Amino acid sequence: MKPTLPTLLILGGCAAAAISLSSCGPSGGEKKEAAAPAASSSAPASGASAAATPANVPAGDLVDITPTYPKPLFVGTPPPSVPIPNLEKADPENAKKMETFKVPKGTTNVAKGKKVTSSDPLPIIGTLDLVTDGDADGADGCYVELAPGLQWVQIDLEKEYNIWKVLLWHFHKQSVVFFNVVIQVSDDPEFKDKSKITTIFNNDIDDKNKLGKGADQNYVETNHGRLIDAKGAKGRYIRCYSNGNSADEMNRYIDVQVYATDAK
């Protein structure tokens, strides 16, 4: 069982967030033109698929996008304090390769500034708009903390898009693993019509979220976030689930960036 965070720590966290002097600066992405690479028949290394040319890319030139990554808040990628099943092996070199990724020309972060809702209507720390402010800084005052257990945040992109990449940052001030991470795309704001739901990431190998068993790996949070290949999935809404973390039962989100083009 994961430990319950004492009430005193929760109250202390609220006070700290209220008086924090840290500021969340803007974060963007640099675009560069890139010719479409030749197709490769070799299988990607673990964790590397998101950096490859996205599947289902329409014909035409691609561009390179290099988001502005926040500074690391710890050195290296130390293992979590408790054993984690299905945990990917840390690969700093692969993380560097994924800093720049290819997407179709015209792709932008369509999530920036969009409305965010949540399964927890009263976050313990922070506000939901932090999830789409474009800033991935892990400092105090730059994240929203939701209640223990299974929770989600949802972004309304306001219209349907072809989604190529999703870049997700949970709390990365410490070396932690967030559990049962599932990311889904849909045109149904309630996510009830299964025929309209596309799951683009799922490391819930035990199906604790009751959303289906996943095949992705657990990973340690870093300043690079987690880059996910959405393969052109169509949808208006993005929902990100988590179920506590390796340090405590809370769910903390910093930023979600959705790189997409108008739906075709």
Regions found by a protein language model. Give the residues of each.
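N-terminal pre-domain segments of enzymes
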Residues: A34, P44-T107
